[in-house]
């Protein structure tokens, strides 16, 4: 499945801590997301699904996610229909091995293009 991963204005990756969750873009935005850290060895910190602005807001206050903040935290998301989300999240978790989160949907993975 080919999905459109979102970037912020200027075609740059969105910083987790400052992306404007009040922007109209987030109204009714549901799907999957990826949070990663920068630095010399960038890595995926968390993947998930749901109402994007709510999930991002939650992870801004999650100590496990914020432990990687000194490396720079970034987020991207894609709108995915509800019936595909579990499979897409399962694929992302298997492919990206996030550092935080251990319970992912036990379903057949649905492969999607990665944002990088």
Which role fits each region the language model picked out?
Residues 54-76:
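A broadly used, surface-exposed interaction patch
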Residues 1-50, 57-58, 80-91, 114-116:
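GIY-YIG nuclease catalytic motif and its immediate N-terminal context
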Residues 98-113:
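Coupling/hinge elements of helicase-like and P-loop NTPase modules
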Residues 68-71, 79-81, 110-112:
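Short, intrinsically disordered/low-complexity patches at protein termini
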């Amino acid at each position: 499945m080919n999905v459109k991963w979102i970037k912020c204005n200027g075609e740059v990756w969105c910083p987790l801590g400052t992306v404007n969750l009040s922007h109209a873009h987030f109204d009714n935005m549901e799907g999957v997301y990826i949070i990663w850290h920068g630095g010399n060895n960038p890595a995926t910190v968390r993947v998930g699904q749901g109402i994007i602005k709510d999930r991002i807001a939650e992870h801004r206050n999650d100590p496990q996610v914020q432990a990687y903040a000194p490396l720079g935290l970034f987020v991207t998301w894609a709108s995915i229909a509800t019936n595909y989300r579990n499979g897409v999240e399962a694929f992302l978790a298997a492919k990206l091995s996030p550092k935080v989160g251990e319970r992912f949907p036990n379903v057949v993975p649905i492969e999607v293009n990665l944002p990088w």
